[in-house]
C-alpha cells in the first residue's frame, strides 16, 4: 500500500485565509464509513479534509435581482418628471396664456403626464350678459316721461283769464260828481268782518276819516280799508264776496 501525507500546517493556513474571504463559506467534511480501508498512518493523521464552496454570483430561488437603479421590491416606482420636462411644460403653458389673451377663447384645457391645467376667460361672458336688461328697461321709461306734459298744459291757464274780466263788469260807474274811494290792491271785496255779521257801513251812514269801511282779501291776508275822508256813504259800487282789481271804485263818500 502506498502512503499519502499532506502537511497540516498548509491546510490550517488555507482555512484561515479562505474563511475570512467574503462570500465564501467553509464546511468541514467528515469521513463516513464506506468499506474502504486506508493505512494506519493515513487514517490517524489525516482523518478530515476541508471542502470549499463559493456562493458568489449564485442565484437563490427567493432572492431579488439587482438592477442598475437598485433592488426592485415588487412595487412600481412613481414617475417623477424631470426638470427639463417641467420647463418645457411651463413654456407651453405661457404660450397658451398668450394665445388666450390674443384670441376670443373662453376656456382651454391642457393635460400632460400627471398635470392638468384649465384656463377660463370670463371677460367675454361678463360683457355679453349685462346689455340684455338695459334695453328692456329703457323704452318704458321714455314713454312715461312723454305722457304727463300734455295734461297740465291745458287746465291751469283757462280759468284765470275768465275770472279777471268778471271783476270789472259788475262795478257800476258812480253817478255822483264826488270822487269814489278806490281799491288800493287786487283781491276779494268783503263788506263785513265775517260771515253772518253786520257790514262795516251802509248807504247813508256817516263815517270818519280813518274808519274801516271794508276788507279786501289778498294772498290769504285780510287787509282793512279805511275811509280817506269824513262824510256820508252815498253809493256802494262793489259787490260783497267778488274779486276787485287795483283802482276799482268801492264807495262814494260825500263830505
Curated annotation (Swiss-Prot):
The keyword ATP-binding does not apply. GO terms for cellular component: acetyl-CoA carboxylase complex; chloroplast envelope; chloroplast stroma. PROSITE patterns: BIOTIN, BIOTINYL_LIPOYL. Primarily expressed in 7 to 10 days after flowering seeds at levels approximately 2-fold less abundant than BCCP1. CDD domains: biotinyl_domain. Residues 178-254 form the Biotinyl-binding domain. Residues 149-162 have a biased composition (Pro residues). It is found in: Plastid, Chloroplast. InterPro entries: 2-oxoacid_dehydrogenase (IPR050537), AcCoA_biotinCC (IPR001249), Biotin_BS (IPR001882), Biotin_lipoyl (IPR000089), Single_hybrid_motif (IPR011053). It comes from the Eukaryota. Residues 163-180 have a biased composition (Low complexity). GO terms for biological process: fatty acid biosynthetic process. Residues 1-87 form a transit peptide. This protein is a component of the acetyl coenzyme A carboxylase complex; first, biotin carboxylase catalyzes the carboxylation of the carrier protein and then the transcarboxylase transfers the carboxyl group to form malonyl-CoA. This is Biotin carboxyl carrier protein of acetyl-CoA carboxylase 2, chloroplastic. It comes from Arabidopsis thaliana.
Amino acid at each position: 500500500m502506498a502512503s499519502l501525507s499532506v502537511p497540516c500546517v498548509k491546510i490550517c493556513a488555507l482555512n484561515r485565509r479562505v474563511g475570512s474571504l467574503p462570500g465564501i463559506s467553509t464546511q468541514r467534511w467528515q469521513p463516513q464509513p464506506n468499506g474502504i480501508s486506508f493505512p494506519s498512518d493515513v487514517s490517524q493523521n489525516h482523518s478530515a479534509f476541508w471542502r470549499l464552496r463559493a456562493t458568489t454570483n449564485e442565484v437563490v430561488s427567493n432572492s431579488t435581482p439587482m438592477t442598475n437603479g437598485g433592488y426592485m421590491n415588487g412595487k412600481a416606482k412613481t414617475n417623477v418628471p424631470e426638470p427639463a420636462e417641467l420647463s418645457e411644460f411651463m413654456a407651453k403653458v405661457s404660450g397658451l396664456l398668450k394665445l388666450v389673451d390674443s384670441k376670443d377663447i373662453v376656456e382651454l384645457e391642457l393635460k400632460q403626464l400627471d398635470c392638468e391645467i384649465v384656463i377660463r376667460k370670463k371677460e367675454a361672458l361678463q360683457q355679453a350678459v349685462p346689455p340684455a336688461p338695459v334695453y328692456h328697461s329703457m323704452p318704458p321709461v321714455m314713454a312715461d316721461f312723454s305722457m304727463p306734459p300734455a295734461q297740465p298744459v291745458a287746465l291751469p291757464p283757462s280759468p284765470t283769464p275768465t275770472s279777471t274780466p268778471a271783476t270789472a263788469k259788475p262795478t257800476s260807474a258812480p253817478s255822483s260828481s264826488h270822487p269814489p274811494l278806490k281799491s288800493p290792491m287786487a283781491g276779494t271785496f268783503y263788506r263785513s268782518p265775517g260771515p253772518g255779521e253786520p257790514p262795516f257801513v251802509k248807504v247813508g251812514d256817516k263815517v270818519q276819516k280813518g274808519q274801516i269801511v271794508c276788507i279786501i282779501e289778498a294772498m290769504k291776508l285780510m287787509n282793512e280799508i279805511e275811509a280817506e275822508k269824513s262824510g256820508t256813504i252815498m253809493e256802494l259800487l262793489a259787490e260783497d264776496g267778488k274779486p276787485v282789481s287795483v283802482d276799482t271804485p268801492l264807495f262814494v263818500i260825500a263830505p
